[in-house]
Amino acid sequence: AELVIIPRHLFSTPSLLLDYICYRKVTVLIWAASALGLLAVLKGLEYKVPTEIKKIFFSGEVMPVKLLRIWQCALPGTEFVNLYGPTEITCNCTYYPVERVYEDGEKLPIGMPFEGRKVFLLDENMQIVTEPEKKGEICVAGESLALGYYRNREETDKHFKIWQAGEKSFRYYRTGDLGYRGADGNLYFAGRKDFQIKHMGHRIELEEIEARIEQVEGVRKCCCILDRRKNRLKAFY
């Protein structure tokens, strides 16, 4: 197969981007979720459907299921795979083949670890989380783990740790992402630790509020913040 690097300037014009993908007869697409979402929001697939595509891998951020549905409807025979992983694990560590159409309000799993990668959850007491549905910080290890940050010992020591279990030990990376294991055994992304706030005595995930608002018809994307001056939550869409 031939590797096709799509010119960056085409991403600003959906029609030209789709023309190029169709002209080059792209069969496997490896994209950021935001790029797929942009084409869906701008109704690019109503202009042209790249029917040669057999597989689409997406990562980088949470893919809204209502935008993924647009792609699934346009390409019903195409395989979609949700990838997850920080740059520090070079570059993805889990995968989830999307085998059905998800409805609004459902969460898309980030799946299971690739071979050679280890993914586990740690609670606030640095204990491994094993209970289903209980959140913890996603930590990753494996053969592709980075050595650290170039010429930045402080950040390296902060995020790259050693797990000691008896006589065995291994290096791992604390992603700062929250996750949990579902009853189906899959891993689910649950936002960033630094996006978790305490408001009126309640621990709140801003990304969960954003996800709920994005289910409202007509809302494409939402951003939620805490206004500390007025002690109020504010949402922008």
Residue ranges and their predicted role:
Residues 37, 79-82, 97-237:
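AMP-dependent adenylate-forming
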